[in-house]
């Protein structure tokens, strides 16, 4: 009998055991279910069944039962996968299920025992590993040898997705044996969340003025568009048009119609994430929304409240109906090789992914970002929505990476809406010294100044009167920034003195409304985004 895990009591006595066959079967079932979301269930099951084949050795059993030296238990399954099934990418998933996806290396020059995948595969495999599976009552699937994937970028994304399925399944099956029920799941399903949203917006359906009528039209257009086919979409809504709730309406309806797993919002700034996540929690219930970025504290300690533990567990694999995260978190995971980063990836498949403030995608990395979006749609059955008031021109790039997937606008009356939502006039000023600019700002009771650097923002702020003046930058911790934004909104609402100097963090979707905005010269998209802070709530 070969064991995969032993549970010990505080005195070091074994109190429960899980055989290799039990662990492989449990992992394979989960991995298959995860991979079914993008049509790779057979591969998901195969890598689950083979991943811990190397535990069927005296060396590993000595390690497990008598704290012997470490042994490589991942390579055996990788060799079996490559040798008997010809599935090289699947073998990579198995080889790296603890240490991370390995560098493939060079088939001609790598030697047996090298750390590359080719080097590890050349170590060979003893037939007794497979014999041990048979002795344990396990049956390996009868699958044909895999054909090579001609597109290497597509192959890399598929490999990471399958790797994610295996890593998450392995963690979950092991966790279930070692710790029992830790409180994962228990979320409301997508149809329930859609019904909750529809109830929330029902009072809005009798607008009392022209602007609210337009907002209702946008909302209802997005809700109806949710029945459209999966694909690539843009949502171009002018400032003040209510795109946060409108995009959520599309996403939930679309997910409900197509049986999709979740809605994921990708947002450039944590200040906007905090704002939008608060809206989503208010509508859908806090237990159904995960806010995941570097500023969120996650607590898995024994004394943590159950809701905090549930949130921390959801952050490990994004197994929750609504995720609000950063572009950095998403794209770094899509191009990562570490198990902790990749674990969540399979939950991007068959999901609605909304890129809010899409104009903020980083220009130096635009091609890999767009390639990932295209792959999520074309390979992994997801729908991608680019949502902003200032839509970037990504059509050619998307067409190159996802041929045959046209990009469709969800709100086709965009041009007319911009005219009807026009609430801002622009005027170019001559260059001003810091002191002169501070003097101009001091002449107004309520004014916002946006500059291009943190250093400039600090200099100008220090020249303003202390009473009613605020300075915002990305160096602030989230709690401090949110406290300042709350004070700013309250002072604006009460008509009190409120002068704010900020970097560009405030111009992309932060919900504030100033009568006057100064914007240091920048790209046209930044200037238009700055205009969002004036006239946002007009009407």
Identify the role of each PLM range.
Residues 285-335:
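Inter-Walker segment of RecA-like/P-loop motor cores
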Residues 389-442:
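Interdomain hinge/linker at the junction between the two RecA-like core domains of SF2 helicases
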Residues 1-199:
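Accessory nucleic-acid engagement/destabilization modules that flank
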Residues 260-283, 293-296, 393:
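Conserved Walker A/P-loop ATP-binding site and its immediately adjacent core
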Residues 229-251:
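Walker A/P-loop
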Residues 6-10, 291-303, 452-455, 469-486, ...:
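Conserved helicase motor
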Residues 262-273, 440-465:
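Conserved strand-helix element at the start of the C-terminal RecA-like helicase core
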Residues 65-75, 469-482, 487-489, 497-539:
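Conserved RecA-like helicase motor core of SF1/SF2 enzymes
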């Amino acid at each position: 009998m070969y064991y995969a895990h032993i549970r010990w009591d505080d005195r070091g006595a074994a109190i429960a055991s899980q055989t290799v066959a039990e662990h492989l079967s449990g992992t394979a079932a989960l991995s298959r279910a995860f991979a079914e979301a993008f049509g790779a269930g057979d591969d998901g099951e195969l890598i689950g069944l083979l991943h811990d084949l190397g535990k069927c050795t005296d060396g590993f059993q000595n390690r497990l039962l008598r704290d012997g030296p470490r042994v490589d238990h991942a390579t055996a399954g990788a060799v079996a996968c490559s040798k008997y099934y010809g599935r090289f990418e699947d073998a990579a998933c198995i080889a790296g299920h603890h240490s991370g996806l390995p560098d493939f290396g060079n088939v001609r020059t790598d030697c047996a025992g090298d750390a590359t995948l080719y080097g590890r595969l050349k170590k060979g495999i003893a037939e007794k590993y497979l014999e041990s599976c048979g002795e344990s009552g396990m049956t390996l699937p009868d699958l044909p040898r895999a054909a090579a994937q001609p597109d290497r970028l597509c192959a890399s994304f598929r490999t990471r997705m399958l790797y994610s399925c295996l890593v998450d399944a392995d963690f979950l099956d092991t966790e279930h044996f070692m710790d029992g029920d830790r409180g994962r799941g228990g979320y409301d399903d997508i149809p329930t969340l859609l019904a909750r949203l529809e109830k929330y917006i029902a009072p809005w359906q009798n607008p009392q003025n022209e602007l609210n009528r337009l907002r209702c039209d946008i909302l209802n257009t997005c809700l109806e568009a949710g029945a459209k086919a999966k694909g690539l979409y843009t949502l171009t809504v002018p400032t003040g048009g209510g795109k946060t709730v409108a995009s959520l309406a599309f996403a939930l309806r679309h997910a409900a119609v197509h049986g999709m797993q979740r809605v994921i919002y990708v947002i450039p700034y944590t200040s906007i994430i905090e704002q939008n996540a608060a809206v989503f929690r208010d509508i859908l219930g806090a237990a159904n929304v995960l806010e995941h970025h570097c500023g969120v504290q996650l607590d898995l300690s024994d004394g943590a409240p159950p809701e905090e533990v549930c949130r921390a567990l959801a952050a490990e694999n994004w197994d929750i109906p609504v995720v609000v995260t950063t572009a950095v978190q998403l794209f770094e995971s899509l191009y990562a090789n570490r198990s902790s980063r990749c674990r969540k990836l399979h939950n991007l498949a068959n999901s609605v992914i909304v890129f809010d403030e899409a104009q903020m995608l980083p220009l130096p990395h635009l091609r890999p970002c767009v390639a990932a979006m295209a792959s999520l749609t074309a390979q992994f059955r997801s729908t991608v929505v680019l949502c902003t008031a200032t839509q970037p021109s990504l059509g050619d790039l998307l067409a190159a990476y996802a041929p045959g997937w046209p990009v469709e606008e969800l709100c086709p009356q965009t041009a007319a809406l911009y005219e009807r939502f026009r609430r801002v006039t622009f005027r170019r000023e001559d260059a001003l010294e810091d002191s002169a600019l501070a003097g101009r700002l001091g002449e107004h009771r309520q004014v916002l100044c946006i500059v291009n650097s943190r250093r400039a923002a600090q200099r100008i702020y220090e020249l303003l009167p202390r009473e009613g003046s605020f300075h915002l930058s990305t160096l602030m911790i989230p709690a401090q920034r949110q406290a300042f934004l709350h004070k700013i909104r309250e002072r604006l609402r009460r008509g009190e003195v409120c002068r704010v100097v900020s970097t560009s963090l405030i111009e992309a979707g932060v919900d504030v409304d100033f009568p006057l905005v100064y914007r240091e010269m920048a790209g046209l998209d930044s200037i238009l985004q700055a205009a969002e802070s004036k006239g946002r709530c007009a009407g």
